[in-house]
Amino acid sequence: TYPVSEKMRTTSDYTQEFVFTKDISEGYDHEVTLDLLPGNYNVMVWSDLVQTSGDSHFHNADNFAEIRLQGDHKGNNDYRDAFRGSNNISLVADIMEHLPDTLDIAMQRPLAKFEFVTNDVVEFIDKESVRVASKANGNKAASTDDTPTRAVNIEDYKVVFYYVGFMPDAYSMNTDKPVDSSTGVMFESTLRKLSESEATMGFDYVFVNGKKSAVTVQIGIYDNEGTQLSLTEPIEVPLKRSHHTIMTGMFLMSEASGGVTINPDFDGDHNLIFP
């Protein structure tokens, strides 16, 4: 809780701090009781997730003016999700017994989520089957029967996402905007089949302001020996707060380039298809 004046809030320490935990298997809504002296308050709430009690948080929220990602960057983890909210309340001294004052705070994500889905799994397996067979034969030409064996397991391949330029890594509750970013950010992932032809390559959460934003990434594919098989051109990923952007294309077999088509039929999602 902070003084209600915005000027005071940015120049003085908070009045009181409260920390609560809750099992979200029971739902995200949470009702708490606070013991506050009479006065005007701005109540600011930050909520993030841990998988099990005692785990380290992905965010360091000790300073609401600069909530930072901490530790090595970890993509592909829905426990990176987080929520923020604020509201004002006036508490008056009253010698008469009355019902406690109540305050509802609507929580919203200060984040956007993006995900890459590749739709050339069959072609990739065919190509890799031939390459692996050729390598097994001492780099000789494959057999005259060039039908792939389909012994390739796509989960054996590593996907690496490289952020090109800056990746926002700090957020201010006071301004409701990202306030800092880092360069050289990357994270690893694996391919997970969605169907015979499609696989998800990985996803991440990014701090964004209330307007549309974007990050740029490159995606590298590596075999189980660490050999780089491909690296896309830089891909700009459009982001919108509390929306899930899904990028679909032939990311395994070819460098991603060209325009995108936005499917507006999703509520809360962007579908972007690389032709």
PLM feature segments, named:
Residues 104-112, 204-211:
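Conserved "repeat-terminator" motif of extracellular CCP/Sushi domains
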Residues 30-32, 101-105:
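Short strand-edge motifs at loop-to-beta-strand transitions and within beta-strands
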Residues 108-122:
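A short, Gly/Thr-enriched small/hydrophobic beta-strand-prone motif that recurs across taxa
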Residues 1-57, 126-239, 272-275:
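Tryptophan-paired
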Residues 250-275:
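Intrinsically disordered, low-complexity repeat and linker tracts
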Residues 19-24, 51-102, 184-194, 225-254:
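Structured interaction patches on ligand/partner-binding surfaces of diverse proteins
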